[in-house]
Amino acid sequence: MAPSRRTFIHQLTSAGTLSVMTPVLSQFEIKQTKIKPMNNKIGFNLLAWSAIVSDELFPIVERLQKIGYDGVECAMDAREKSAYQRFGKHAHDLGLEVTCVLAVGPEENPIDGSLNIRQKSLDRIKWAIDRAHDMEAKVICGPFHSAFATFTGQPPTEKEYVRSAEVLRQAGEYAAQAEVTLTLEAINRFECYLCNTMGQLVGLVERVSHPNVKAMYDTHHANMEEKKFKMSINKVSPVLGHVHISENDRGTPGDGHVLWDETFASLAAHQYNGWLTIEAFTRNDPKFANAINVWREFSPTWEMAENGLNFIQNMCIKHKL
């Protein structure tokens, strides 16, 4: 049974105050000298702390900047416009860029049979584009091709791909006006059914056929759904617009069993020059953690940020990315 908007999406986007504030800088950060990859910017997804865009994230953003990140990624929640404007200004004042992540629920499902619900999905995506524009963000990523954790008990149908493409094509037109790129995410079979693999995702992006609608690659989901990392990156590379660096357990990148050398070598072979953004999860925001079934701490939060950045930089150097 599909979760209601109140019980799922509101959990994603209506979590409370931060439960873990920023401690003093570690010796890692004091000694860290930023090694810039040749072409790629490195970001960190703030869902590790909160699903809410608010001023409470400012100290965290400041510390991420001191560690050496190029940008931060925030969730698109239902807060007022001014919260996004303040957040964007604070990030840009620190010299950081912003990217965004969006999910939609069953009441805003782009593949629903109801035209009214599909219109609500388009309105929701347009709202997110407006908020991205408020923050001067250029990328919105996420699995908003269909509703998160909403299932019919059947495989995806041709009609559902057609409906999704129609909504996303209109969203792409709107995004172009704001100079925003929508990067769609294939996620695992336990969280959606429309796009689990790069093959399905590329097929959808090609149906949309709009320059402001591209694909993203998430290593966590690829580790579950793809036969080979190299083959899946080869498949998505012509339409690839964003990458999430995420370990198999959602902990510190490099500490698990994702095939990182194969991943970075394949990205380098295709001269990928977009964002490499760490997406790692914690229980710092209990409502969000419960909504995505995170029941334990995979790694200390700041260890994920510190060691994750160092890991990506070293992999970029190793594979000349």
Regions found by a protein language model. Name each.
Residues 12-22, 34, 116-214, 299-303, ...:
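Active-site acidic/histidine proton-transfer and metal-coordination neighborhood
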Residues 2-43, 50, 55-65, 138, ...:
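Histidine-acidic metal/acid-base catalytic patches
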Residues 86-94, 170-175, 232, 262-266:
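Catalytic-core regions built around general acid/base machinery
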Residues 73, 185, 191, 226, ...:
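Acidic-residue sensor for enzyme active/binding pockets
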Residues 48-50, 76-78, 104-106, 146-148, ...:
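Active-site-proximal loop/turn and secondary-structure-junction residues that shape catalytic pockets
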Residues 70, 74-169, 273, 277-287, ...:
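Structural motif corresponding to the early beta-alpha repeats
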Residues 67, 94, 178, 270:
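Conserved dinucleotide-binding and phosphotransfer motif residues
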